[in-house]
């Protein structure tokens, strides 16, 4: 058997660990070969590929961040228009099964391909942890660790200067990074996309802390956080070519409004892409490895149209159709639990 793999969408700590595990399992357990398509779906459309071998170079991938195959965003319309070319590329390279590793967009494309009779096994990847039907995705723990460490460091400087600090973290639709890093770092408030915020409530919480003699205030803000209607009007950034909203810096805009209303020194830190770069944590290396092994097993078992998934302590498989039906968002009850620590 000959397996094809690609990494799609944004990069993520643990991608190389998945690649390593697939290559090693296919070679050692099944005697199968693996071809990697470069730069995600673009490489599949353009037939740019490389042979992946179970050698010393493959072994060194475990702790390396990013993806050695490269990745890119490709518009779904371009994929649909290129269906014939995709099938031709797979046929020309003798690919029996394709393993796309990616987030919502990549897995949605994988599901579409499976409906077009392409043998596919999906591997979920996102630092946002918003893929449904899996308890967690690799990359999330690393991003959470980076965010928590950054907020830990901001506590001491905020306390020294009696400042209000707003920390913007990733999370377009789901606030898992913000919620967990806020709890782990002892932040005084967390704002997530699932729960619209009122700027006046933010200001009241800040004032209450300083009035009782506390020295500083840390608020974690997910990049996709939105105000309740009538609270504050954010600048509109329009949509990108994929139909995703362009963010215009919610933390900076909120910070300016808070500073104006309470006359306190407010500073904003945007963590940005540092959250998804660098060496994956031990948890992400292990999870990514287990996903890779299971994806290789599923491919050789003929279990196509599936996504590997973590449920409890076990790795299993779920239909791609179920996994891409909706995003996994933060439940209101989880936010309520965190809110007990606000202030």
Swiss-Prot record:
Native organism: Mycobacterium leprae (strain TN)
What is the gene called?
pfkA
Under Enzyme Commission nomenclature, its number is: 2.7.1.11
- Keyword Ion transport: yes or no? no
Active site residues of this protein: 128
The protein's site described by Important for substrate specificity is found at 105
Protein name listed in UniProt: ATP-dependent 6-phosphofructokinase
Q: Which GO terms describe its biological process?
A: canonical glycolysis; fructose 1,6-bisphosphate metabolic process; fructose 6-phosphate metabolic process
The UniProt record gives the binding positions of Mg(2+) as 104
Q: Which GO terms describe its cellular component?
A: 6-phosphofructokinase complex
Q: How does it assemble?
A: Homodimer or homotetramer.
Q: Which HAMAP family match?
A: Phosphofructokinase_III
> Which cofactors are named for this entry?
Mg(2+)
The protein's annotated pathway: Carbohydrate degradation; glycolysis; D-glyceraldehyde 3-phosphate and glycerone phosphate from D-glucose: step 3/4
Entry superkingdom? Bacteria
Per the record, what are the reactions this protein catalyses? beta-D-fructose 6-phosphate + ATP = beta-D-fructose 1,6-bisphosphate + ADP + H(+)
């Amino acid at each position: 058997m000959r397996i094809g793999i690609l990494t799609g969408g944004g990069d993520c700590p643990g991608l190389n660990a998945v690649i390593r595990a697939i290559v090693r399992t296919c070679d050692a357990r099944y005697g199968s070969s693996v071809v990697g398509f470069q730069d995600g779906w673009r490489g599949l459309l353009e037939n740019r590929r490389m042979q992946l071998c179970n050698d010393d170079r493959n072994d060194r991938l475990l702790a390396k961040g990013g993806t050695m195959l490269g990745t890119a965003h490709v518009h779904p319309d371009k994929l649909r228009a290129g269906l014939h070319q995709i099938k031709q590329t797979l046929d020309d390279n003798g690919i029996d099964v394709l393993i796309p590793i990616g987030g919502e967009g990549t897995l949605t494309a994988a599901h579409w391909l499976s409906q077009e009779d392409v043998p596919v096994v999906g591997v979920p990847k996102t630092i946002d942890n918003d893929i449904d039907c899996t308890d967690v995705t690799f990359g999330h723990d690393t991003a959470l660790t980076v965010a928590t460490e950054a907020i830990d460091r901001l506590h001491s400087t905020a306390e020294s200067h009696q400042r209000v600090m707003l920390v913007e973290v990733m999370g377009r639709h789901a606030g898992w990074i913000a919620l967990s890093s806020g709890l782990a770092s002892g932040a005084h408030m967390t704002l997530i996309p699932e729960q619209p915020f009122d700027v006046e409530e933010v200001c009241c919480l800040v004032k209450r802390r300083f009035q009782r003699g506390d020295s500083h205030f840390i608020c974690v803000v997910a990049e996709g956080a939105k105000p309740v209607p009538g609270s504050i009007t954010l600048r509109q950034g329009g949509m990108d070519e994929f139909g995703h909203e362009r963010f215009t810096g919610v933390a900076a805009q909120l910070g300016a409004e808070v500073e104006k209303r309470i006359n306190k020194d407010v500073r904003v830190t945007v963590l940005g892409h540092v959250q998804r770069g660098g060496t994956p944590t031990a948890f992400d290396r292990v999870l990514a490895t287990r996903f890779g092994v299971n994806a290789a097993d599923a491919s050789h078992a003929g279990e196509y149209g599936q996504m590997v998934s973590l449920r409890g302590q076990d790795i299993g498989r779920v239909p791609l159709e179920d996994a891409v039906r909706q995003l996994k968002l933060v439940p209101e009850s989880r936010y309520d639990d965190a809110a007990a620590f606000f202030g």
